[in-house]
Amino acid sequence: MTIRISKLGHVNLRVADEETSKWFYTEVLGFKVAEEDPEHGGVFTTLGEDFHTLDFAQHPNPEAAQKPKAGQIGLVHMAFQVDSHAALREAYIHLLEHGVEIHHATNHLNQRSIYFNDPDGNGLEIYYELPYALQLFPEGRGDEDERLEVSAPGEPLPAWLFEDWPGPEMKARIEAIRQQTQAEAASKSDTKEAVPA
């Protein structure tokens, strides 16, 4: 028997400066402050679905604290999903407008992602995932990730942000899976109704 975890509840980050982290996650990424505990320290933020999603604990000695380094054991990144490729483009532009350096972007075939760091150096990802991603790649994606061009603040935006993505072939595959999924759901519903109580 295993523990039956229903979902990931929240993440708590130790930060060099609670106020800087609060500003970054609320003003740049759109989190809302759910609660602050000035007496004991701590800022609790939410995306609106739960009481808190991401919390910050002030490091007791921020001058001595070390930022995470690439390649060390620990958190690689936290990922935040958006609902469309247009929303990913808006996020990219918004990050640049706030002076955030985007390290890289990737086309994972079933999703496109942009990667950057928070003020403490924690890795973050914003991504748009295609509908029916599991059904599109039932055998897995393999290692077919494609690096995408990125731009710095003030530079021209990369062309992939403005592509019609996914293209016509992938859209046709998604539509076929959607229709098949609906047909299977309708068939199950008809079967349940046909069974006498």
PLM feature segments, named:
Residues 14-58:
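Core segments of cupin and vicinal oxygen chelate
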Residues 136-142:
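Flexible, disordered linker segments and immediate boundary regions flanking tandem C2H2 zinc-finger modules
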Residues 6-10, 73-77:
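Short, solvent-exposed beta-strand edge segments and adjacent coil->beta transition regions
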Residues 1, 62-68:
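Short beta-strand/turn micro-motifs at beta-sheet edges
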Residues 15-20, 72-73, 79-123, 128-134, ...:
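Vicinal oxygen chelate
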Residues 37-38, 61, 107-109:
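Short beta->alpha connector loops
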Residues 51, 70-75:
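Short connector loops at helix/strand junctions that flank enzyme active sites
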Residues 44-48, 66-69, 115:
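Short glycine-biased active-site loop of nucleotidyltransferases that positions the nucleotide triphosphate
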